[in-house]
């Protein structure tokens, strides 16, 4: 409050206070406030003879804001100069900048680049013997492995990870214990899910007591995901509604998308309920849609379409009706309808127009 109400410009002597406020805003899940505070930190860096370290830290927090709001191009453009800043490594934030940048590239569909960044950070920290940073980096490595479908690698990390103690400050961009809970849920075993449930319950109490809203949101979302995969759909919606209500003021989007497709069904039910968070839920679902398109492009979904479906898709693109398509291909209208429904399902579309747009986005169709 003192910084916000200060009559004059914030000076270099107040830099530690501004940095502390950045972390407070982050843990409070107040992305708008964090953006403002990070601006102040960048200005201090500019005033202090272009202090590269101060500018790098300000860019780190700006990058977090842009990433969580799913503004991926802005996040990348903001983080790259922070990583290149000569004093960033001395500040100790270079690894954290690298973690967020890797998440950006993963979200952009550049999985190999994301993996290369994290693996390079782990190798560097192993050489330098920086134990605390390596601890976080290996958790990030496991998190990325899980997101890229390399469950065995994530499971190997989990086998060697002790979640205790849970009493420490969660102030960076990820929490290793939450990665562990995700691995246990992904394993699909009853024992793993039971362990995940107990850990998440402990973390919920710890984070609520510390007013750490940022990671409380993620814990609630993971609890909803766990309940969803266990078939407890009503409970999943109730818990997820709490998470979304906490996330909406700050505009958090990526937090949900990064947890995976299991959250889509309860999010859709929340959206249909048309509550006070319906608009924000729509933004999250739209980001899930974008994520699927990126992933689908990597997996070449076009290969899943049959030759007949591809022919029908091309005819849909030139706006032929079902009757015209049946005459063109000498098949019944019922057969056209069946193939069209298969096309919609494979492209996750709900209309002809949406199917054609997605097919063009995935380079299944071209205008030529």
Task: Show the residue positions of the predicted features.
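TPR/TPR-like (Sel1-like) alpha-helical repeat modules
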Residues: 237-252, 261, 271-278, 289
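TPR-repeat structural position
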Residues: 31, 72, 111, 131, ...
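Inter-repeat boundary and helix-capping residues of tandem alpha-helical solenoids
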Residues: 9-12, 52, 91, 131, ...
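Amphipathic alpha-helical segments of tetratricopeptide repeats
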Residues: 2-7, 39-50, 80-90, 119-130, ...
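Helix-turn-helix DNA-binding segment
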Residues: 286-289, 293-341, 345-350, 354-367
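Tandem amphipathic alpha-helical repeat scaffolds
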Residues: 1, 13-30, 54-70, 93-109, ...
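Generic long, charged, amphipathic alpha-helical segments
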Residues: 192-226, 294-298
